[in-house]
A protein has these predicted regions:
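N-terminal intrinsically disordered, cationic/polar leader segments
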Residues: 1-180
Length: 180
């Protein structure tokens, strides 16, 4: 038995094939536009993130020269308190205690790690591709260092810088959520 296709069925199948081709072309066009839009958005987000990275570098550069004076001021305050509280303690012991306090509040290491993380953010953004998860991790690391900087700081200036950093990190984190 052989199947017979009527002229109307044949016309319907041709029309259906034509519609399928149109749908496929529209889907491809929409997909191409989506990819192009995401690429443009990714470039803009990358630029925004890099601007904040540069602002954070500026903040680190502002904080670094303040460290020696902040530590010296802190040591002097601690020395005065210790002398007042324990006039009977020997001067060498006070210097040792002050050294311990100074190492607890020294934030140079945090500033160095911030710079390293900022370098990595810039490298990852420049690399392109699917970088969202990597950037999210780096935002966590930056936030951790900024928190440590704020908590260890004995200077209101350095604390204010750490707060500014945290705001920039939060802005970057919001943008990173939009990156694949």
């Amino acid at each position: 038995m052989q199947w017979q296709i009527s002229d109307s069925e044949r016309a319907y199948l041709r029309e259906l094939a034509k519609k399928q081709a149109e749908c496929a072309a529209l889907a491809k066009s929409a997909l191409d536009e989506l990819i192009a839009t995401r690429a443009r958005e990714g470039e803009k987000l990358g630029t925004m993130i890099l601007e904040r990275v540069e602002r954070m570098r500026t903040l680190v550069a502002e904080a670094a020269p303040k460290l020696p004076q902040a530590l010296a001021d802190y040591q002097e305050r601690m020395a005065t308190r210790l002398r007042e509280a324990a006039a009977s303690l020997d001067e060498e012991r006070i210097r040792q205690e002050m050294g311990l306090f100074a190492t607890r509040v020294d934030v140079a290491e945090e500033l160095n790690r911030l710079v390293a993380h900022l370098d990595e953010v810039a490298r990852v953004v420049g690399k392109g591709g699917a970088i969202g998860k990597r950037l999210d991790f780096l935002m966590q690391e930056l936030n951790r260092e900024a928190n440590t900087l704020a908590s260890k700081s004995v200077s209101t200036e350095i604390t204010a810088i750490a707060v500014d950093m945290k705001l920039l990190i939060e802005q970057m984190r919001e943008q990173v959520q939009n990156i694949e």
